[in-house]
């Protein structure tokens, strides 16, 4: 039988690996007047095509053809449309008839460009942006990602991994410089188990989305308040049929449900609960816990469509997380306790404005609450973020235009005590009160115009933003050009100016800044491509340069905007598809320097003149991902990644005080940790029981060879000896099963 899959909601658990959520692709469909659809996909010569993805249009359900080109989808509503697609071929639609049992014969023709099937004004391919598009299937099929979108993005060229978390450090930029949008609404806290370097899991489950676009530099004037990158998440649309799925594994359990409401509405709901005790019983951790990491999340959405009023979608998400884990920092050893709550709501309305234009309005916000205690640090944090965006896009002939406005309001309240010296959780140098009551708002307007003439596509954009806290207006011009060289080859160039408001963490009322300017950056990107992302072979190489100004920098009064820096590098991405192998190779080189103080490192080091390597400067990284269909039932995937260790500041001595030993630090980030390397493996098996029950079994191994990667150094009490901090993620095994029933 052919290999059949479809999608659903995976458990929200930090140790949940991609094998588990691959199971969630199997969904049950329950709908009146359905058809059991079988068929064969072949090329123009009549030969069967294996590995073709046959998708039920407008849903997350799909099947994959077997060696003989055959596929089957049960419970498909009559009148529905299937879309068959495979790299190197043009996608082909097929409509399901009213017969109780339908068989389709689909022929794919050779081609290189995937046409849009979205029902709205078409947008041209961005001419000079570093854009990568991922689906939930891409995420779960990448070994070692634990079915997490942020971990999948860490495997891309240009993204540096500096610890065991999922923070996105893009092309020499800090994790805070990445803008995350969900249905046009800003997600101000896009990580779970949040840390200063991001977090240990993404807050948005990939199965809440129909896809994600990740732009690593040179992005257009459509996006503001970001210095480095943009992650734009698109939620699932209206369900076309009823779906239900239940999944269980070592890390947790989950259930999801989706159903249409009449012919123009629909609802989705999902709930996940982690079971950490079972996971850690099978995979003991070298780290000590007095409260195992755990939590739950629930999500839901409502969609309504009207030919006259347009479409409206409202999505809500609620999450709870907690952990109590032993922390080693400098000479301190103690437990870190954290409890978090996160709620997100996003609403999006779209309506055609004439035959060539589309109007879009997004509005929503997220609310984040967190309590943290470790050593002398004790903080209670509350932050609410509200954002809105309105756009009008369309055009005619060779012209395309986009105009709009956006804005957001952030209210931050933090109260507690922190070490006087950043990172001194033992309080050797003392502690002090920490209080933030900060409000800021930003409003922007933007316009982008592009024109294609022969092999040349040019784009020019301009945006202006008002930052209230700094009482300034910024103007950012941006431009890009793509030149087609023929033979599926092209050259891309982009240049632009970018601004972003500084983090509220710099505005401590005790020793923080009173006013900081908006940070700024200038991007220059030059790229070469051969092939197309939808083709059998695709390659991209990009070189870039970034200049930073007005970065926060510590001074006697707290912080000023006197910091600056730069980064330069190159990224390479290669993708090749054979009949029995899907191979992706990537690599990056990076040189970055900054004169800048992270908020949590205030008074930690003696700052020299000039610049130094930031914590996230990883000079090189290389990765390879291979996916192999063993048979119609079994699929195997493996990944390998290596990278230079991150820089760190060594302790070169200590001074004994009444409270203990205070470290004497060497030059900032003058040493480097050992090289990082990791191999991950996963396998899955899918079977059907009758026509209405599908089961998938999965297993995986993270860090297959058990390498002890080092992300931090700790010291003895007098700083006379140092040791690598134990990894919280050694070799880990996972098994589970997902069952879906079609009624």
Across the structure, where does each feature detected by a protein language model lie?
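Periplasm-facing N-terminal accessory domains of Gram-negative outer-membrane beta-barrel systems
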Residues: 29-127, 160
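Membrane-embedded beta-barrel scaffold of Gram-negative outer-membrane proteins
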Residues: 360-364, 370-371, 484, 491, ...
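Short strand-turn segments of transmembrane beta-barrel domains in outer membranes
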Residues: 198-202, 210-220, 227-259, 269-273, ...
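Structural signature of Gram-negative outer-membrane beta-barrels, strongest in the C-terminal barrel
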Residues: 309, 317, 393, 398-402, ...
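Transmembrane beta-barrel wall of Gram-negative outer-membrane proteins
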Residues: 250-273, 287-322, 336-359, 396-399, ...
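Gram-negative outer-membrane beta-barrel transporters
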Residues: 452-453, 457, 545-547, 562-652
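C-terminal beta-signal and adjacent terminal beta-strands/loops
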Residues: 633, 642-659, 676-678, 684-743
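Periplasmic N-terminal accessory/gating domains of Gram-negative outer-membrane beta-barrel systems
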Residues: 88-92, 98-105, 116-220, 230-232, ...
């Amino acid at each position: 039988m052919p290999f059949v899959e479809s999608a659903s909601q995976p458990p929200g658990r930090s140790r949940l690996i991609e094998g588990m959520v691959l199971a969630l692709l199997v969904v049950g469909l329950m709908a009146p007047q359905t058809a059991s659809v079988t068929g064969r996909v072949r090329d123009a010569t009549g030969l069967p095509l294996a590995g073709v993805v046959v998708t039920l249009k407008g849903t997350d359900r799909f099947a994959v053809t077997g060696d003989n080109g055959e596929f089957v989808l049960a419970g498909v509503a009559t009148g529905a449309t299937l879309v068959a697609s495979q790299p190197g071929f043009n996608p082909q639609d097929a409509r399901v008839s009213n017969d109780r049992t339908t068989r389709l014969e689909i022929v794919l023709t050779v081609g290189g460009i995937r046409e849009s099937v979205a029902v709205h004004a078409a947008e041209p391919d961005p001419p000079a942006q570093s854009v990568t598009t991922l689906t939930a299937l891409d995420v779960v099929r990448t070994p070692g990602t634990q079915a997490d979108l942020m971990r999948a993005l860490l495997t891309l060229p240009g993204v540096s991994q500096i610890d065991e978390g999922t923070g996105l450090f893009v092309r020499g930029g800090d994790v805070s410089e990445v803008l995350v949008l969900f249905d046009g609404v800003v997600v101000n806290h896009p990580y779970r188990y949040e840390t200063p370097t991001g977090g240990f899991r993404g807050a948005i489950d990939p199965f809440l989305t129909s896809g994600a676009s990740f732009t690593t530099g040179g992005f257009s004037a459509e996006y503001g308040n970001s210095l480095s990158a943009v992650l734009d998440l698109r939620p699932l649309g209206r369900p076309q049929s009823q779906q239900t799925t239940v999944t269980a594994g070592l890390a947790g359990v989950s259930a999801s449900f989706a159903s249409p409401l009449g012919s123009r509405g629909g609802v989705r709901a999902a709930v996940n609960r982690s079971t950490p005790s079972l996971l850690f019983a099978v995979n003991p951790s070298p780290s000590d816990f007095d409260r195992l990491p755990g939590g739950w999340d629930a999500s839901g959405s409502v969609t309504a469509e009207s030919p006259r009023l347009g479409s409206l979608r409202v999505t809500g998400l609620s999450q709870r997380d907690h952990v109590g884990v032993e922390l080693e920092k400098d000479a301190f050893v103690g437990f870190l306790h954290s409890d978090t709550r996160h709620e997100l709501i996003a609403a999006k309305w779209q309506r055609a404005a004439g035959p060539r234009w589309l109007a879009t309005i997004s509005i929503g916000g997220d609310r984040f609450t967190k309590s943290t205690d470790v050593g002398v640090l004790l903080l209670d944090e509350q932050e609410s973020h509200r954002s809105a965006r309105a756009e009008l896009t369309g055009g005619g002939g060779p012209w395309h235009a986009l105009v709009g406005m956006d804005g957001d309001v952030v209210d931050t309240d933090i109260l507690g005590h922190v070490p006087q010296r950043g990172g001194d959780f033992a309080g050797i140098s003392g502690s002090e009160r920490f209080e933030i009551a900060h409000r800021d708002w930003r409003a922007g307007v933007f316009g982008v115009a592009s024109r294609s003439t022969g092999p040349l596509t040019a784009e020019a954009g301009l945006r202006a933003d008002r930052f209230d806290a700094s009482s300034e207006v910024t103007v950012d011009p941006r431009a890009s050009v793509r030149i087609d060289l023929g033979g599926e080859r092209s050259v891309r160039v982009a240049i632009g100016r970018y601004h972003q408001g500084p983090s509220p963490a710099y505005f401590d009322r005790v020793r923080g800044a009173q006013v900081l300017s908006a940070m700024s950056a200038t991007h220059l990107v030059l790229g070469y491509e051969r092939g197309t992302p939808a083709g059998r072979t695709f390659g991209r190489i990009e070189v870039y340069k970034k200049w930073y100004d007005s970065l926060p920098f510590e001074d006697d009064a707290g912080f000023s905007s006197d910091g600056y820096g730069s980064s330069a590098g190159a990224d390479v991405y290669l993708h090749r598809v054979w009949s029995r192998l899907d191979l992706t190779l990537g690599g990056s080189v990076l040189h970055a320097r900054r004169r800048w103080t992270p908020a949590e490192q205030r008074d930690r080091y003696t700052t020299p003149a000039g610049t130094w390597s930031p914590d996230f400067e990883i000079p090189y990284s290389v990765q390879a991902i291979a996916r192999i269909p063993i048979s119609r039932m079994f699929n195997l995937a493996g990944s390998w990644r290596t990278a230079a260790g991150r820089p760190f500041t060594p302790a070169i001595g200590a001074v004994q005080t009444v409270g203990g030993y205070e470290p004497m630090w060497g030059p900032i980030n003058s040493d480097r940790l050992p090289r990082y390397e990791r191999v991950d493996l996963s396998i899955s098996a899918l079977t059907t029981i009758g026509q209405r029950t599908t089961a998938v079994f999965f297993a995986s191994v993270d860090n297959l060879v058990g390498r002890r990667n080092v992300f931090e150094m700790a010291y003895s009490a007098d700083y006379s000896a140092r040791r690598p901090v134990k990894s919280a993620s050694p070799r880990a095994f996972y098994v589970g099963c997902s069952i879906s029933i079609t009624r």
